């Protein structure tokens, strides 16, 4: 009779948790003395050493990381929004659809991020608040540029950046440049849609306001989306984006109210009352009104 077959012992997984030699771990490269590593590529030493709490409170690290990661996401939003605006300006709409969809998903990510900050209770925030000075998200130059590129222009909002000339120049350029929505209207004018003259050439530092000729043009698109498919798709991407932006703003309001109530903000604003007023801002008014008028 033949010998019984012995069960085969599984080969070592190579996982460091199972005691395998590092050199054999799935043939992965382990020596980065002469090549770029993950940490090198991402500049992790700089990023992970950029958190400098000013209080002894444990929860300040959460506050700092929350806002730093938000700034990183906003950097990507600006990267996509500027590129999308360039596409529209250059009569090349399809690439802009992906860029705008990505911005909307980033905003979804930021909506969820408020849930993390909401784990900070009022006593925990109060312990670190005296150490914040006058610093406030109100002063974020990237956020201000996002507002401006989306059409919510306000020249008074340049002043918080006057102490940093490079940032001031960047935000001022965004204020004085046609917004993404302005470029969409100019695109439509180049393709045969009729608009009031001041929709095409105006003081670009002024905010977008409702205009009947703009709504009439979008109504034409929405009444025959097949014929105007690219413009229809662009319009819906705008609506998706504003919908996500509204949710981001709303979660900001509710999180602030939950953590600090109706105290004034560290930057001097009315806090929750100021943030609630911002909920009334409409970025693309004609695209919302036409839903009633169709």
Swiss-Prot record:
It is an enzyme of class 1 (oxidoreductase). Its EC number is 1.13.11.11. InterPro entries: Trp/Indoleamine_2_3_dOase-like, Trp_2-3-dOase_bac, Trp_2_3_dOase. Substrate binds at residues 63-67, 125, 129, 266. It catalyses: L-tryptophan + O2 = N-formyl-L-kynurenine. Residues 1-20 are annotated as: Disordered. It comes from the Bacteria. Its cofactor is heme. GO terms for biological process: L-tryptophan catabolic process to acetyl-CoA; L-tryptophan catabolic process to kynurenine. The keyword Repressor does not apply. One of its GO terms (molecular function) is heme binding. Heme binds at residue 252. Pathway: Amino-acid degradation; L-tryptophan degradation via kynurenine pathway; L-kynurenine from L-tryptophan: step 1/2. Keywords: Dioxygenase, Heme, Iron, Metal-binding, Oxidoreductase, Tryptophan catabolism. Binds 1 heme group per subunit. Belongs to the tryptophan 2,3-dioxygenase family. Homotetramer. Heme-dependent dioxygenase that catalyzes the oxidative cleavage of the L-tryptophan (L-Trp) pyrrole ring and converts L-tryptophan to N-formyl-L-kynurenine. Catalyzes the oxidative cleavage of the indole moiety. NCBIfam families: trp_2_3_diox. This is Tryptophan 2,3-dioxygenase 1. It comes from Ralstonia nicotianae (strain ATCC BAA-1114 / GMI1000). The lineage of its organism: Bacteria, Pseudomonadati, Pseudomonadota, Betaproteobacteria, Burkholderiales. The gene is kynA1.
């Amino acid at each position: 009779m033949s010998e019984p077959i012995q069960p085969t012992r599984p080969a070592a997984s190579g996982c460091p948790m199972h005691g395998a030699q590092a050199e054999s771990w799935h043939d992965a490269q382990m020596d980065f003395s002469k090549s770029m590593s993950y940490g090198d590529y991402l500049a992790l030493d700089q990023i992970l050493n950029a958190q400098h709490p000013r209080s002894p409170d444990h929860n300040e690290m959460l506050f700092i990381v929350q806002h730093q990661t938000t700034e990183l996401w906003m950097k990507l939003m600006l990267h996509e929004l500027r590129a999308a605006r360039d596409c529209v300006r250059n009569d090349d709409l399809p690439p802009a659809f992906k860029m705008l969809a990505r911005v909307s998903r980033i905003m979804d990510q930021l909506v969820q991020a408020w849930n993390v900050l909401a784990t900070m209770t009022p006593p925990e925030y109060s312990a670190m608040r005296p150490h914040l000075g006058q610093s406030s998200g109100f002063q974020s130059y990237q956020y201000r540029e996002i507002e401006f590129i989306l059409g919510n222009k306000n020249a008074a909002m340049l002043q918080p950046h006057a102490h940093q000339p490079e940032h001031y120049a960047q935000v001022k350029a965004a204020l004085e440049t046609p917004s993404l929505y302005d470029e969409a209207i100019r695109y439509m004018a180049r393709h045969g849609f009729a608009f009031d003259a001041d929709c095409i050439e105006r003081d670009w530092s002024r905010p977008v306001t409702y205009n009947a000729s703009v709504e009439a043009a979008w109504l034409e698109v929405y009444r025959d989306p097949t014929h105007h498919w690219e413009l229809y798709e662009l319009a819906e991407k705008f609506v998706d984006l504003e919908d996500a932006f509204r949710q981001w703003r709303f979660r900001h309001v509710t999180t602030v109210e939950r953590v600090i109530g109706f105290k004034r903000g560290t930057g001097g604003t009315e806090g929750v009352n100021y943030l609630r007023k911002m909920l009334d801002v409409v970025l693309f008014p004609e695209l919302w009104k036409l839903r009633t008028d169709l």
